[in-house]
């Protein structure tokens, strides 16, 4: 996949040709949403990076497919744009979401969802194709899963990514 330069307002941003999905299809949905936002708002990567509180080179690398955003940066993006994470990942057509009255952490939500699950942690780790130690780190709050894993967990629990991430109280 070759990178191209698109000229916007005397600045450049790095991107892939429209229609190509960088990295993988789940992360590609997020990247496509960011790319569309930049195009529709005539915004540069520099301005966008400032808006979400991220380094310009990080955003450029998301757009050219050399890096994937962390879940923390996905949340920062959603917060800065006042959009749902599910909208950024093309899981819903609605950008708006109802913020949680008292936001929860990912680990709190995961604990709550696991309490009604019949499977043990080792089985779930195998189903989710992660190491059991990763699940332990998610549960104790020392690590967040990658965005594509959050997407898959939301599918597994039949809830929104925003609910799983503690951004809304609506599953």
PLM regions: where:
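A short, Lys/Arg-rich alpha-helix, primarily the initiator
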Residues: 3-43, 94-119
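Short, structured motif recognition centered on aromatic/hydrophobic residues
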Residues: 34, 71, 110-113, 121, ...
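The alpha-helix within a helix-turn-helix
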Residues: 38, 49, 78, 114, ...
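DNA major-groove recognition helix of helix-turn-helix
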Residues: 38, 63, 73, 89-92, ...
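Residue-level detection of the helix-turn-helix DNA-binding "recognition helix"
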Residues: 39, 53, 64-66, 93, ...
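Short alpha-helical DNA-recognition segment
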Residues: 41-61, 118-137
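Residues in the helix-turn-helix
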Residues: 58, 68, 84-87, 123, ...
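DNA major-groove recognition helix of helix-turn-helix/homeodomain DNA-binding modules
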Residues: 72-87, 148-163
